[in-house]
Amino acid sequence: MPADSPGTPGRNYPFFATDIVLGNYAYVEEEFSFEGQANTYSIKPGTNAETLTSGTAYRSRMLVRRPATQTRFNGVVVVEWLNVTNGYDTDVLWLYQKEFLIREGYAWVGVSAQSVGVSRPPNGLRVWSPSRYGRLDVDGQGKVPGDALGYDIYAQAGAAVRKVPAVLGGLEARLVIAAGQSQSAGRLATYLNSIHHRDPVYDAALLTVNAATLRTDLTIPVIKVLSENEANSSRSQADSERIRTWTVAGATHSEQYSLLSRAAFLLRDLNLQAVDACDTPARSRVEIRYVYNAAVDSLVKWRRASIAPPNAPDLKFSGDILQRDDHRNALGGVRSIEMDVPVAHDAAINCGLGGTHVPFDDQTLSRLYPTHADYVGKVRNSAARLVKAGFMLKADADLAVANAERSIYGERLVCGPLCADVRQFPSHPSSILLAKQTAHLLIKDGSTLVALVDRATRAIAEGDTLGNDPRSKKKFAEAAAHLRSYVSKTQQFLAGGKVARESAALLIEQATTLITLVEARTK
């Protein structure tokens, strides 16, 4: 499907087209419509489905992000059942895993398989862009309820990855992994339990933040990665020959990375801001995405080389009560760095699926980490343990350690509201949030931008530490200067094609807001 540039008025471009300049990483994004005929099924839990009807015509679309050349391609395709919980198609797992997928040479395909994402007002594809998507039909022109055609639509999309050369631009798929997040993972679990055996398309599957029970006689390996939100149900199914369940302590169903990763294109395509409306500071900072990455890597090794992934410890319960430490963080489960080397209370409590993130006070941080080197060393050791255990990849561990080295933990600096990692823009502008937003957009040479914000963070913290000392004004002036340099450099990156227009606009707006607030502290 030919496309105009994302953000153009006619909306002749893919819905939620990526806000990454993929060409900088030798990747491309393409969208295809595809059509066929689908069955509906009688589905009973734990049994093979029976065909109810056959031959219903459909027309859907798939969004493909892939290496531009065979040399960049690792031969593995992740096919994501797009999530429609918010009333529109969302590429949730791509958002979490894009850095890993691009780094390691995966292809990714997102499939529209449900009528909410295709037809429901106000943001279904057909409503959002009638000229581009008006012919799509995944519910038999409204006559087939319950997304009953979706299973065959998803299966046939997976088959097309292998059988239709145009889908991958001539690249050869050697392994195809099914993937779904939350609601989509529930649909995928039903497909795996009852339908996939009829015409096996997928070689492995990743189900995230949905604890649906799977049949133990499945013929493909499956890993379920769960957060604290699904903790009770995660204990209902033990690991088996082809199934693993990894529950991540402190992680939440939808956390900060998920929110920041969609901020630019959400504003571009729907004029919506990715914000929270929670009384208690929300959005866990536990990096569940690193466990997702390890799960995909493990599935590939499991399928290709029969190397079984590790069994993960369960979260610790007393009856139905999740046990917590003195910081109110969960005990047991996959121990993320954020749980092993905590700087905050992170949990699934509070605000629906967003959970909680409440930073420790300065006294607690100073007691836990007397020096910056102490903090970084503990992060490094935790990352090494996770890599050895199989729940984190070495490249992600290196990134986590680098982030620790960039931080100011252990330096006995006061990080006030203008630099604190709490809540979100625009309700809580802060330099650390700006640095995270910048990093999450995968800007080519984006470390240059992040470094400028880090300098601003340090200057703000030094100013906060000085308190009413007149020298604090100089520190805030330094911070404002670093942020102005950031804006200038972002504009240069936009002109040079390193950052997408919508991403640059978001970052410049956030930085400008922060500059105004920081400059007020120089008066």
Predicted features along the sequence, with ranges:
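Soluble extracellular-acting proteins and domains
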Residues: 351-523
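C-terminal His-loop and adjacent cap/lid subdomain of alpha/beta-hydrolase
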Residues: 1-423, 495
